[in-house]
Amino acid sequence: MQADHKKITRLLKTARGQVEGVLKMVEEDRYCIDIVNQLLAAEAVLRRAHCEVLRAHLGHCVAG
């Protein structure tokens, strides 16, 4: 589970950084399409984190 924890933590920290960047873009009144693209990138990382949490759950809680 430790490797899963590290991977999930890394993904969530990446997502946090992306969301903070999006917030800064909004505050700076940046171009909407650029903001949307960054939001899509953040969503993709959150989806990966979601899948990793589910995979870890299946591997450790359901199967174990």
Q: Residues of each region from the PLM?
A:
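Solvent-exposed interaction patches of small proteins and small membrane subunits
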Residues: M1-G64
